[in-house]
């Protein structure tokens, strides 16, 4: 898609800048919130490009806002430090009450701002696994571990989608098995034909499978398959980082993961160590095709090839 390519080009140009920013931390005061209308009453909020060293394509995670007479439903909450900016952007869309906020996964760039909205009366909704992860220290994204307001109060597990109706929209919270983390959810707006997929798909850098928080390669592949089945030919998919894609964009992404997995498995079968597998450059056929794929191993701005290969090796070596 043209929009996605333009955004990724900008992100690539900012990768060098991200190396410097990585050492300095995130300059939250420089982050501005951009609002984009996705459907008549559905909006996407995103942070400034080339400010967040971990996400040069846009600071923090993407936020969804469903607005209307029934109140506001939000998807994710960004960093705690920019909660006031996010709130101002939401209120500019609609001054009504923020009734619900659902989290796609537990990382701080998606959940650290939860307390800002919970204290205004929003009911926090998420997977039980996500709540359990957030309750364990350390807190993420600047959130205070001692502040219970940041934790979801309405939780669900793996199973059928949680479905509700609001503002003329049918919203589905679709749980997926351990993928990016152990408590991922994709959120579908049926009438708008939009799905917010969280971080098990990203269009900058290689996949990030957070095994420390329950993520798995097998689950990430399954989540991609589920998304391709649920999405229609015209469905707009909003990743946690990056611009819109559609289901056909997921195919080369999935195929790349499968190819790397199979090559790493082959080398493990030959008795290769992780360092030997890294030296084999198994991602070489994809490095120039994956935006950010040529970033060196010590660079911020997305998951590098070496980081991804280490994740794959670790999971396959463990026989998972």
Where are these regions (language model features)?
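Short N-terminal segments immediately surrounding and downstream of signal-peptide cleavage
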Residues: 25-40
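Conserved beta-strand hairpin/beta-sheet module of binuclear metal-dependent hydrolase folds
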Residues: 37-90, 185-189, 193-197
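Bacterial N-terminal signal peptides
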Residues: 10-20
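Divalent metal-coordination and catalytic microenvironments
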Residues: 41, 66, 76, 90, ...
């Amino acid at each position: 898609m043209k929009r996605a390519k333009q955004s990724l080009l900008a992100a690539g140009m900012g990768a060098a800048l991200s190396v410097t920013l990585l050492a300095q931390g995130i300059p939250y005061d420089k982050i501005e919130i951009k609002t984009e209308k996705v459907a008549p009453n559905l909006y996407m909020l995103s942070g400034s490009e080339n400010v967040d060293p971990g996400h040069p394509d846009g600071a923090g995670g993407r936020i969804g806002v469903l607005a209307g007479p029934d109140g506001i439903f939000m998807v994710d909450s960004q960093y705690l430090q920019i909660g006031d900016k996010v709130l101002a952007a939401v209120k500019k869309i609609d001054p009504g009450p923020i009734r619900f906020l659902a989290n796609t996964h537990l990382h701080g760039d998606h959940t650290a701002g939860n307390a800002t909205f919970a204290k205004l009366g929003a009911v926090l909704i998420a997977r039980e696994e996500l709540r359990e992860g957030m309750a364990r220290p350390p807190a993420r994204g600047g959130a205070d571990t001692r502040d219970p307001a940041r934790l979801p109060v309405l939780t669900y597990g793996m199973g059928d989608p949680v479905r509700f109706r609001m503002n003329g929209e049918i919203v589905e919270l679709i749980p997926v098995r351990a993928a990016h983390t152990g408590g991922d959810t994709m959120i579908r707006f049926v009438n708008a034909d939009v799905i917010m997929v969280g971080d098990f798909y990203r269009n900058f850098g290689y996949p990030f499978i957070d095994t420390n928080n329950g993520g798995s390669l097998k689950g990430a592949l399954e989540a991609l398959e589920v998304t391709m089945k649920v999405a229609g030919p015209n469905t707009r998919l909003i990743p946690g980082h990056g611009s819109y894609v559609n289901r056909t964009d997921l195919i080369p992404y999935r195929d790349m993961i499968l190819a790397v997995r199979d090559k790493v498995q082959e080398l493990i079968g030959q008795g290769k160590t992780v360092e030997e597998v890294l030296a084999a450059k198994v991602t070489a056929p994809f490095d120039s095709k994956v935006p950010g794929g040529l970033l060196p191993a010590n660079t911020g701005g997305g998951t590098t090839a070496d980081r991804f290969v280490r994740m794959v090796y670790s999971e396959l070596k463990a026989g998972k």
